[in-house]
A protein has these predicted regions:
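Conserved, structured core segments of small domains
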Residues: 1-97
């Protein structure tokens, strides 16, 4: 099943994010078997990071929660809120990316 994992940064976490970026990226590479797509969210026209959005393909909500909890950004407190929502694949157009 697909789940959207929407992570919003806590306030004032730029340095915290930077210091945990390498392990975060390593973690995502290790999750490529379930990670459909993901990336940082930012304010258009600026470099201001707002959080991250991931689509994961896992068997259960608990597995989506485990994905989120295993992320070094989550463990370090980079994210102020994480919302996990089940979703259906309605349109799939990877060539549009």
């Amino acid at each position: 099943m697909l789940y959207a994992v929407h992570c919003v940064d806590a306030k004032g976490v730029d340095e915290l994010r930077s210091s945990h970026l390498a392990p975060h990226k390593e973690y995502l590479v290790g999750q490529k078997h379930i990670l459909v797509v993901g990336g940082a969210l930012f304010t258009e026209g600026t470099d201001e990071l707002l959080g991250s959005l991931y689509i994961v393909n896992v068997a259960s909500r608990e597995a989506a929660e485990a994905f989120s909890k295993g992320d070094p950004f989550t463990q370090a407190g980079v994210f102020g809120t994480v919302t996990i929502t089940a979703m259906r694949k309605s349109h799939w157009n990877p060539a549009s990316a």
